[in-house]
Amino acid sequence: MYRRDFLKSVTAAWVAFGLPNPLGGAFATNRVIPLRRLGQSQRFDYEWLKERARALAATPYHSRKRVLPTPLERLSWDQYQSIRYRQDHALWADSDAHFQVKFFHLGLYFHSPVRMYEVVDGMAQELAYDPAAFDYGSSGLNGKGLPKDLGFAGFRLNTRKDIDRDFAAFLGASYFRAVGQEGQYGQSARGLAVNTGSSGPEEFPDFIAYYLEQPTADADTVVMYGLLDSPSIAGAYRFSITHADVLRMDIDSALYPRETIERLGIAPCTSMYQVGENDRRMGWDWRPEIHDTDGLFLWTGNGEWIWRPLCNPLHLRFNMFLDNNPRGFGLLQRDRDFDHYQDDGVFYEKRPCLWVEPKHGWGEGSVQLVEIPTFDETFDNIVAFWNPRNKPHPGQELLFGYRLYWGAFPPVSSSLAYCVATRTGLGGVVGQKRKYFSWRFAVDFVGGKLAALARVHDVSVEPVLHMTRGRPEIVSARPLHEIRGYRVMFDVVPLEDSAQQIDIRLYLRDTNGEPLTETWLYQWVPPILEERKY
């Protein structure tokens, strides 16, 4: 399936799920209606699920997408959004557990039923779909006439203390989201990415079953499992989700390829970047900036900290950052100033960062970044993931463990200064006639030792600047007292006959040659000769 066609449906459906449930309180009652179970309970643990995934990979793939009843197929987005799971049917609402589960209905874009199981004392039993568990709102449906075995589309988690607002949701293919202390959804994670950014169609694996382990009354963590399947690979996942200001997901995955996979994406992060300070190409909206995240943050295996601002390119852009045993990576929303977005409906300044922390050595490979052109803020056009160096082959077992952190800031930080803003525009000297085209970059760094250095006169802070082609001009690094940091400014003069991309690398160092800042990377594509205005 082609990514844009798929994401037109699934990512649009996520837009409103970060909002409180306006109907949730109306469903709250003291009476709890237990969910009906199907069949006999069976022994369950993660080893059993891994064997199930291994056996699945040894058989031909078959799609679980079903033809839905016409009324469900024809739902508008507003109609689908009005269908809500009833609080009196919530899983674990009749227990003392801190967590509860509510399910999503099939319909609109969601055609693949996901089987749901509850795990109690090591025994798993399937949960039955029940039309009476849903309030159909303004959808025009009342549940009558729907198949008894229709199934669920996904689920969301909330706490007993806040039944109207979920903190994590799993819906569509292998997508899931969570919130931190800001209580705002933003970017997504996925169980797996297959052939993202390649020349052919991308494959979107599905979680086909979830196993939800009933937590004890005093547990601050909920444990669940997912069975994943797709034409080229099957997998078993274990999630341990700790609800806190920075929400943590501890994930173990076991993957079993059916086919050789060209590009496997581990721990994929999916986000949106339409317009920002550094890239205003799509800036015709009245809002100054529109993005879920504004940069890729890397902590490499050799200890280097790297910041790569995101872009909304003219054409699909693919970058790989070679590494060995990475310490972490993620898509961050560093700009948290409401004035930079001016959107009091979706609150982009509150969107969570997502940080990936490998639990053990992942070996050689690369963090890969895919940036896709977009005209629409409901289309997720940014993907980052880990790609192992060796392509997976049938018969292998691939084990990856990692933690995901969702919150306003990543759980790790460097003692070095970091980039807080990247701005670009026409180069040259103000008041002087420009004789050729150049492009200006202004990069602001704060933190580390810079605040102290900015207060001292005659201190030498040197910018270290490299670029793959073209030449730099008017390079400077000076204190900027308004931010208690430094601003680096430079112009890039592209080759006259080339519109090839220019890779730029920058950091600040002191007189002893020691770095003062993280490494700032940028990829700039100059306009063709005929479009260079100066």
From Swiss-Prot:
It is found in: Periplasm. InterPro entries: Gal_mutarotase_sf_dom, GH-type_carb-bd, Glucan_biosyn_MdoD, Glucan_biosyn_MdoG/MdoD, Glucan_biosyn_MdoG_C, Ig-like_fold, Ig_E-set. GO terms for biological process: beta-glucan biosynthetic process. Residues 1-28 form the signal peptide. One of its GO terms (cellular component) is outer membrane-bounded periplasmic space. GO terms for molecular function: carbohydrate binding; catalytic activity. Pathway: Glycan metabolism; osmoregulated periplasmic glucan (OPG) biosynthesis. Keywords: Periplasm, Signal. Pfam families: MdoG. Predicted to be exported by the Tat system. The position of the signal peptide cleavage has not been experimentally proven. The keyword Signal applies. Probably involved in the control of the structural glucose backbone of osmoregulated periplasmic glucans (OPGs). PANTHER family: GLUCANS BIOSYNTHESIS PROTEIN, GLUCANS BIOSYNTHESIS PROTEIN D. Belongs to the OpgD/OpgG family. This is Glucans biosynthesis protein D. It comes from Xylella fastidiosa (strain M23). The gene is opgD.
